Every structure is written in structure tokens, then in C-alpha cells.
A protein has these predicted regions:
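Surface-exposed extracytoplasmic segments
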Residues: 1-310
Length: 310
């Protein structure tokens, strides 16, 4: 399991983890959109490495929580402790890494903004927006958290996962970000008339998704397919997409190869072109932005992210 935070870490964003934050990987085992098993990660204060103001190290702990404590708070069984920038291995075949890494996400963010402006302000479908084929995230770094554990510590068979970041320290716990399926706020919840929709989504849970976000997701899909003239019945197609992506959790059959494609979601590999998949599903056309994750930034073994850009 892997999550990344601090886009463009280094020059314009922190290269450390928030010491009053709780990062979590959450798994629903029975399809009720509530977590049953959670892996919680917390970090200590940052310190300079050998007096270098551009390099920092933090201690971190990973806890596994089940049942009621899986949903809230930092409680759980401590399974891994270590320091950032180093791969941590335990006798139980657990591995963890937290630290600077290359951003493996690929997408033309500028083109997506042009596409959305045409859709919402000019009420037209503009696939030509993606002709520039520029990866906005090329040569960017992030801070990554990567954990590898025996799959029985999660469960068996089909699970549904998502990750969250919450403020957690002196103040009460407040969730500020969540990720399950990619690009939900950037594509399906992008209507500028829906103010603060992204923030509302990031503070919600998957159990809230059907109630809170069914209508805007359906409205977006129906609108874009109608403008693109790509669905015989835009309303019916919107309902099909809604059934597939809401709640916005990532399905995965444990111990099988991960892949995220138009036909099916089964986890998500680091090299999957998720921007192209989501654009294709949202518009019901073979639409992509012409860029894909750079496989040269991977390493074959844990933590799978290669060396950060310098």
C-alpha cells in the first residue's frame, strides 16, 4: 500500500511529514463502506541530517487497528517503527518506507483545466485540449509512505480500500484529505458552481458518498456525454458510472495482480495511466492526455519508488 503527499516536495512544499497528522490506509472487508482494518502512521518532530538544512529525518510508527478503533484515533497495535529515508524490515516480514520519492503520477494538469473551462463556462466538449501531451508532474518529488505486510493482516478475498490524512494532535481529529479512486474531485466534482465541494469530499467518508455526491457525479457524467454526443442515453450511462465509482473506494482482490483499467478496477499499479482511464470513463470516449507514468522511475523491489529527482 502506498500514498503520497506534499506535491512538488522540496522547492515549493515541505519534504517532511506533519508531526501532528495521522496518515491511514483503511480497508472495508464486508462492503458496508466502513473500515474494518486500518494501518495508521504517525511521525515525530523533524531534525536536520548532519546539520544540512535541506535534509531531514523523522521517527515514525505504524499501528494496525481493527474493529471500533479502526475508524477513529491513533490507537492500534504497533507493528513497525523506523526513521524516514530508510527501508524498515521486521522479523514478521513487514516492510515500511517513508520519505522523499519521485512523483509517479502522470497527467496534463494544464490541459485538464482547459477542458473543464470549456465544459463549464463555454458548455462545449473540447477533447483537443489534450493535444499538448505535457506531464505536469515530470521531475517532481513527493513524500511517500509505503507499507508491505502479509495480506492476512488485512483479510481475505475482495476488499475496498482508501487512504486518509487527518490533523491529529493537540486539537480533535479532523480529516483533511482522502484518496480512493483517483481524480474524483478534479473531474467528477469539478463544477465551479459547487463551492467547497472538494473540501466537503475530503472531509467525508465512503459511507457518505452515495448521499452527498451521487447527484454531482451523475450530473457531470450526463452533461459531458451529452455534449460529446458519446452516449445513446446520457442519463442511463451516468447511472452506470455512478454505480461503478460511488462509493469512491478502490476494490482489490488480495493476492492478485493489481490493475486499473477501463474494463475493471482491481487495485492500482504504480504504472497505470489513471488519468486516461478516468477521462475515458467520464466522457464515454477514448480520451486521454497522452502522457503516462515513467517506468524508469520505478525500482523492482520495495519500496518500488525509485530515487527522487535532484
Amino acid at each position: 500500500m502506498a500514498l503520497t503527499v506534499n506535491p512538488h516536495a522540496g522547492p515549493s512544499a515541505p519534504d517532511t511529514f506533519h508531526e501532528e497528522a495521522l496518515y491511514a490506509f483503511r480497508f472495508d472487508l464486508n462492503c458496508d463502506s466502513h473500515e474494518d482494518v486500518t494501518f495508521k502512521v504517525q511521525f515525530g518532530a523533524s531534525a536536520q541530517v548532519d546539520g544540512n538544512e535541506h535534509q531531514h529525518v523523522q521517527a515514525f510508527d505504524v499501528c494496525r487497528a481493527i474493529g471500533g478503533v479502526a475508524r477513529k484515533g491513533a490507537e492500534g497495535e504497533l507493528i513497525i517503527s523506523g526513521h524516514t529515508g530508510q527501508v524498515v524490515k521486521t522479523d514478521g516480514d513487514y516492510r515500511a518506507y517513508a520519505g522523499l520519492a519521485p512523483d509517479l503520477f502522470a497527467g496534463d494538469a494544464v490541459a485538464l483545466n482547459v477542458f473543464r473551462k470549456a465544459l463549464w463556462k463555454e458548455k462545449r466538449f473540447e477533447p483537443q485540449a489534450f493535444q499538448s501531451r505535457q506531464n505536469f508532474f515530470a521531475k517532481a518529488n513527493v513524500t511517500a509512505i509505503v507499507i508491505e505486510i502479509p495480506s492476512p493482516l488485512i483479510g481475505r478475498g475482495l476488499v475496498h480500500g482508501w487512504a486518509t490524512a487527518s490533523l491529529y494532535g493537540h486539537a480533535p481529529e479532523v480529516q483533511v484529505s482522502r484518496w480512493g479512486l483517483p481524480l474524483i474531485t478534479h473531474v467528477f466534482l469539478s463544477d465551479p458552481a459547487l463551492k467547497d465541494e472538494a473540501e466537503r469530499y475530503n472531509r467525508a467518508t465512503p459511507a457518505d458518498d452515495v448521499t452527498l455526491f451521487s447527484k454531482p457525479i451523475s450530473d457531470f457524467t450526463e452533461k459531458v456525454t451529452r455534449l460529446a454526443n458519446s452516449a445513446a442515453n446520457p442519463s442511463e450511462y451516468a447511472n452506470q458510472i455512478l454505480a461503478r465509482i460511488c462509493p469512491t473506494v478502490l476494490p482489490y482482490e488480495l493476492d492478485t495482480p493489481a490493475y486499473f483499467n477501463v474494463a475493471r478496477f482491481n487495485g492500482r499499479a504504480l504504472t497505470d495511466d489513471v488519468m486516461g482511464v478516468i477521462l475515458t470513463l467520464a466522457t464515454h470516449t477514448a480520451l486521454g492526455d497522452g502522457v503516462a507514468p515513467d517506468k524508469q522511475l520505478l525500482r523492482p523491489d520495495f519500496p518500488y519508488f525509485g530515487e527522487p529527482h535532484t
